[in-house]
From Swiss-Prot:
Family annotation (Pfam families): Dynamin_N
Record text on subunit structure and interactions: Forms homooligomers. Binds to the beta sliding clamp processivity factor (DnaN) in the presence and absence of DNA, may bind to the clamp itself as homodimers or trimers. Homooligomers may be able to bind more than 1 clamp complex.
Protein name, per record: Clamp-binding protein CrfC
UniProt organism field: Escherichia coli (strain K12)
Start and end residues of each stretch annotated as G5 motif: 331-334
Amino acid sequence: MYTQTLYELSQEAERLLQLSRQQLQLLEKMPLSVPGDDAPQLALPWSQPNIAERHAMLNNELRKISRLEMVLAIVGTMKAGKSTTINAIVGTEVLPNRNRPMTALPTLIRHTPGQKEPVLHFSHVAPIDCLIQQLQQRLRDCDIKHLTDVLEIDKDMRALMQRIENGVAFEKYYLGAQPIFHCLKSLNDLVRLAKALDVDFPFSAYAAIEHIPVIEVEFVHLAGLESYPGQLTLLDTPGPNEAGQPHLQKMLNQQLARASAVLAVLDYTQLKSISDEEVREAILAVGQSVPLYVLVNKFDQQDRNSDDADQVRALISGTLMKGCITPQQIFPVSSMWGYLANRARYELANNGKLPPPEQQRWVEDFAHAALGRRWRHADLADLEHIRHAADQLWEDSLFAQPIQALLHAAYANASLYALRSAAHKLLNYAQQAREYLDFRAHGLNVACEQLRQNIHQIEESLQLLQLNQAQVSGEIKHEIELALTSANHFLRQQQDALKVQLAALFQDDSEPLSEIRTRCETLLQTAQNTISRDFTLRFAELESTLCRVLTDVIRPIEQQVKMELSESGFRPGFHFPVFHGVVPHFNTRQLFSEVISRQEATDEQSTRLGVVRETFSRWLNQPDWGRGNEKSPTETVDYSVLQRALSAEVDLYCQQMAKVLAEQVDESVTAGMNTFFAEFASCLTELQTRLRESLALRQQNESVVRLMQQQLQQTVMTHGWIYTDAQLLRDDIQTLFTAERY
């Protein structure tokens, strides 16, 4: 019964996708003049690249429906540990780890039961072969000395350059982990080399998902489970602006838009960094059309002063992701621990022991993580102890929960995820097409003079927008100055109060240093929490103020445009952008880590100064902060030296924090405001373009106008049917999802 229902739903999804493709082809070929008429052909506002992208989206959904394939896109920066996370999910090392971007091209990793050894298929290799020929000529002509100035040439890069000079092409098939690593590393080095030699890498040739490399391997966590209808595939996406390639952002957006679900990998230690912010923006751009999950990697670096799991979930759900994800879909983990633990358990189960560390370096990493820094080679022979240590490390990694809640669920319901993805894509397409076509159809019924008036009114709105942007910049700058002045005043108050409290700690020379250390830690932690809370509230208020200022400026323009178009009979089938908060959310510990100068302890300072610095190091989450030439403890300690050193660090912290604060707020607000005004102007320009094209069509002879009216009305009606049927399909799929939970 369940299988029959899936089949019927997939048939309905395929019918709607095919119908949408046909309608899109009609839009492409829709005649704008009668045969034999000399009137020029006029371009639709849906430009050719725009229509081609929609074709690609529909074709991709058809491909996924035919295989009932659920594609889980994984997005994150290199520093977030994306490759390690994928290896942990798969259960074996299928992607190489290097301290540089490793995903220049998207890569599919498909769960293939029984495929123990990974195999990579790279059928669309022709564009790479052409690139190699171009690079071969450039390498012959280039100055190697200049090349070394703009490119880091390590042994892998030298091997690649030698390979290019010899004309060795890429294969279409690679079997085994090491050949796959070599292929993927070479592809990423190829991107770096092409950039250094000023040769365009053929990214556009790999925009279609069927052209990108595919790794087939059995996921260890899914091995032995019963088979289900459908197929689970991971999509490793390029991080935004990885390897200095800004256009990878567009490729990332395209791949995310075509996924069935999205898994974001964020760095626990850098949750509010610029790089992670770019990832969050890319995810938010996908909207609510696909399910979203978050893995917060490197949670093993949490200390007792850091946010706990619940605090991290609340921060990401409410503040960073603006309510687009629930806390239940956020999983703090250690991907490295998860990968190492599972790799060790797999080796023990299949081979009865771990391989020698000198042959496979991951064993050394595992021993260090599971057994501690003082492990010895002899420890690896105690299999029962190693097995227990691997189980403990797996438990500590917290990876079991996302494996169960995400991977197992995705595998069991891959067919439903594929169908739901198709339904949401159909709804988005039909809604956008219907709004556009309805606007065009009504434009043929409006008098030419009225259309000219609408065009002129939007031109005036564009000019007013530019004028208001210049005026509002001054007001926003004033608000920022007020906020920063107030923040700096508060910071100085905290600085003075903290120094007074620190001085009080060192009044009694007879008090044990361990007691001073404990009280010092408490004092510093309290100060940090106070500053963090105040800055959070203070800049939330600034965010609200900026939103109000911009809304007061923009709303009259928006209302005027909508009113004038409504008077002409146009439905509000267009959407103006909304300004979102752009003021950064501050992590005091992270700011301290970024701006404080590392100062070495001198020979004259006692090791007890190192103890106080250690207090700071734990506060800053920097284990080696301030460590220098420490000597053995002496019998006498000058507490005044300790107090002055600590006070100096507090002064430096507050000074540098004020500077970073000003830079980040100014940069963030300026960028956000410019983006907002640019998007608003773009929306007005698009409206103006639609009206101009409606006017041009309206000026054709009556027979052309009538023909266009008939065609547009029929197409609007058909897209209305597609939308209604897609809603019913989505509801039926959701009913099945609900039934699966019980």
